From Swiss-Prot:
This is Peroxisomal 2,4-dienoyl-CoA reductase [(3E)-enoyl-CoA-producing]. Substrate binds at R60, R88, F118, S126, F127, N128, R219. InterPro entries: DECR2-like, NAD(P)-bd_dom_sf, SDR_fam. NADP(+) binds at residues 35-40, 60-64, 86, 182, 208-214. Disulfide bonds: none annotated. Its main location: other.
Length: 292
């Protein structure tokens, strides 16, 4: 079985990198990445920059994205603009996009990676908790996509990749809120691909599985989730890595996928087909993880 590419657990750049794609695949492109200060979004920014792209990374904490940007610039030599923005607030989105366009003069790629999630039975889910996840995942994705379309993509074309999830593919216990929010984003992907395709705008979703070294995995499964994976029969029996997700996003964002639009690319080692889907099993998983 092929070994996964090297990765690091925290929000740090890779100590070394071997190109699997042409190093100038995204030469002089500019990518606007929500949630780019940590986790999957951070690694997407790094991999894009290692392939010639400049990036704008946005998040609610300016300090966090500024720290991340310094790491990215030091590791890749490309430009990275950190901006504070809440995807739920359209005026903030408009301001951030204006700042990015002022800095770079263009935005070629949008990665919607901002998200929020937690485990909760539907019966215990508060109105506000459900709304919060939908506001970040679904409304936030629409807000940023809409603003970028009006300010640049409508006249110049572009690429949008929405980071979603496999939760809605079969229904998942304890994940009604996130599953519903991400399913809506996948539907949005298809609608926008149809409506905006004639203006040379490609729109796709990428649905990761369980990915090591992410805050999402730590929140959902405990700090030692990796060691528990062997108890489940994933077709590819390991966690995915942030670098693997970033490589898949790189493909969708690049000219390699020039005729790909309106799809949901699942990158989870096949786990959506076999992951346990009973409350008892998942609660046991949580209990086991908490003791490790």
């Amino acid at each position: 079985m092929a070994q996964p590419p090297p990765d690091v657990e925290g929000d740090d750049c890779l100590p070394e990198y071997h190109h699997l794609f042409c190093p100038d695949l995204l030469q002089d492109k500019v990518a606007f990445i929500t949630g780019g200060g940590s986790g999957i979004g951070f690694r997407i920014a790094e991999i894009f920059m290692r392939h010639g792209c400049h990036t704008v990374i946005v998040g609610r904490s300016l300090q966090k994205v500024t720290t991340a940007a310094k790491k990215l610039v030091a590791a890749t030599g490309k430009r990275c603009l950190p901006l504070s923005m809440d995807v739920r607030v359209p005026p903030e989105v408009m301001t951030a996009v204006d700042q990015a366009l002022q800095e770079f003069g263009k935005i070629n790629i949008l990665i919607n990676c901002a998200a929020g999630n937690f485990l909760c039975p539907a019966s215990a889910l508060s109105f506000n908790a459900f709304k919060t996840v939908v506001d970040i995942d679904t409304i936030g994705t629409f807000n940023v996509s809409s603003v970028l379309y009006k300010k640049f993509f409508r006249d110049h074309g572009g690429v949008i990749v929405n980071i979603t999830a496999t939760l809605s593919m079969r229904g998942q216990v304890l994940q009604l809120h996130a599953g519903a929010a991400k399913a809506a984003v996948d539907a949005m992907t298809r609608h926008l691909a149809v409506e905006w395709g004639p203006q040379n705008i490609r729109v796709n979703s990428l649905a990761p599985g369980a990915i090591s070294g992410t805050e999402g995995l730590r929140r959902l499964r405990g700090s030692n989730a990796s060691s528990k994976l062997k108890h489940f029969s994933n077709p590819i029996p390991r966690l995915g890595t942030k670098t693997e997700i970033a490589h898949s996003v790189l493909y969708l964002a690049s000219p390699l996928a020039s005729y790909v639009s309106g799809i949901v690319l699942v990158v989870d080692g096949g786990s959506w087909m076999t992951f346990p889907n009973g409350i008892k099993q998942l609660l046991e998983f949580e209990s086991f993880s908490a003791k490790l």
